Every structure is written in C-alpha cells, then in structure tokens.
Amino acid sequence: MAALPRPGQTINASGYGIGLGGKGANQAVAAAKLGGDVRFVGAVGKDAFGELAIKEIQQFGLNTNSVRMVDGADTGIAIIQVEEAGQNTIVVCAGANANWTASDVKAYEPDIAKAKITLLQREVPHEVNLAVAKAVKAAGGTVLLDPAPVGDASHMADLISLSEIISPNETEAAEITGIEPTDIASAEAAARKLLERGPKIVIVKLGGRGSLLVSADEVKHFEPFKVKVVDTVAAGDSFNGGFAVAYSQGQSLHDCVRFASASGAIAVTRVGAGSAAPTAEEVAELLRNQH
C-alpha cells in the first residue's frame, strides 16, 4: 500500500500473502537458515493455519517435535501492513501460544541446559518466559530477549533482570525506558537505563541508522549496510537469529553484531518473514562487499 491507513480510512493494497510467522518462529528459521543447530518450541491450534505452520517449519529444516497442537485453540496470527517505503505495523493475536504455562517448561530443561544461547520474545505468557529465563540462568546459559510486544513495561523488570542480552528496536526502547532514541546520544541513554535493570549487553536496533551496542565497558555504533529496502517485517527477527548463530559459534561481540546486522539487512530486501531470512553464504558475501 502507498501509506498505512488512518483511523476510519479504507485503502487498496497491491496484494497479500499468508505464511509462517511469529517472532519465535521467524528467529528460529533465521538461525536455522544461517546454519544454527536450533531447537524451536512453539504451539499452534488444530486448524488449517496450524497445519500450514507446521508444514512450513519443516520445509525450513526445523524439527517440529516440540511444536504442540492445542485442542480448542486457534493458531496465533499476526496481521502485518506494509507501506511502499517498507515500514510496517503488526497486530498479534496469541491464540494457542497463550496456552503455555510455567509448569510446561520443565520438560524442556535438558535442552535449555545444552543451549549456548536461548532466544525469548513476548508473544507467549510472561510467566513462561520467566520460567525459561530462570532455567537458563540455573544452567549457566545466556538469554537474548527480544522485548516485543512490550505491552505493560512495568511487568518486565524481572524478565529483563534475568536476560544477559536485550535487543529492543527504537520503539521498544522508548516504551520500556521512556527515552525516545532520536539520535545516537539518546539511544545510548535508553540503553544505559536498560543496563541498570540487569542485562550485561544492550543492542538497540535503529533501523536505517544501524545499531548501537552498549555495555558497562563500551559504546559502539554500527553503521547500516547499504541495501534497497523492500519490507522491514523480518529485519529484527533476522538480526536476532543472526546474532544467536554468531554467538553460539564463539565469535567476538562486535562480529556477532556485524553478522546480525548483515542478516537483517539482507532480509529487508525481500518480502516476507522467515522466508526473507538469508543464508550464511549470503551474509558472508555482504560482509565481504561492505566492510
């Protein structure tokens, strides 16, 4: 569509698509396409969308043994609107994802203990994320938290404190901290406010302005890669999936962010969510061409 509709306005779109989505699934697919050894845990309803989701997850090479089909629940959906400039809005209905409980986490503790990094996002109940984060901490692992959707930010303090790494975008950083990252200085201020809550590393994703890495020891701004933006839907998920893969390979923190940035940059050149995520070879080529 030329521009996102205003309240009360009806507009025409050039097309639509239906496919696998959800932040958890998108990040798992992104990591798998980049060569990561991924264990994806999720839930769908016993409906047509659930069957489609499982089929697509399998097509991306992910094991679906840990994807539950929930009786009496709809598969979660995200309604995404994309304007010609590539920006988007997303409305999420959790569906079967809301059926997870903290007690369900115990069955996955052996896998949690083996993981070098665990990706969490807020499209499942808060108490479930909290139980996973506690299990990761007990096992000496690392949590990378994507704090979207933020919702009531006051309820996130305990989860943020258990997350070694948090990677909000501009909007999420503002929602959580009250500081709008309009430039690098304000993005750093928001990141430092997040550091006060427990994480060791904050990575603020700044869209067309790149990303900002902030820890107790350093502040590093990473310039964006030069690409033609088509659709930004998969940018953050591809970034997180890329970071997780590089981190699990033992790359330096700076190289992790560069790898993640390249992954996100390639994703915005394509339409779609998980399907837009690049391969490791594509990321390597972009890193070679744009140092």
Range-by-range predicted roles:
Residues 1-59, 228-230:
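Glycine-rich phosphate/adenosyl-contacting loop at the front of the ribokinase-like
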Residues 31, 169, 236:
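Short, conserved phosphate/pyrophosphate- and ester-handling motifs at nucleotide-, phospho-/glycolipid
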Residues 61, 98-103, 145-151:
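Short gly/ser/thr-rich secondary-structure transition/capping motifs
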Residues 15, 41-46, 65-75, 146-148, ...:
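Beta-strand->loop->alpha-helix junctions that form or flank phosphate-binding loops
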Residues 32-33, 137, 248:
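Gly/Ala-rich phosphate-binding loop of Rossmann-like dinucleotide-binding domains
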Residues 117-189, 208-211:
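Conserved beta-alpha-beta core of the PfkB/ribokinase-like small-molecule kinase fold
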Residues 43, 66-70, 80-117, 122:
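Conserved phosphate-binding/catalytic loop of the ribokinase/pfkB sugar-kinase fold
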Residues 152-153, 157, 184-291:
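Conserved phosphate-binding/catalytic region of the ribokinase-like
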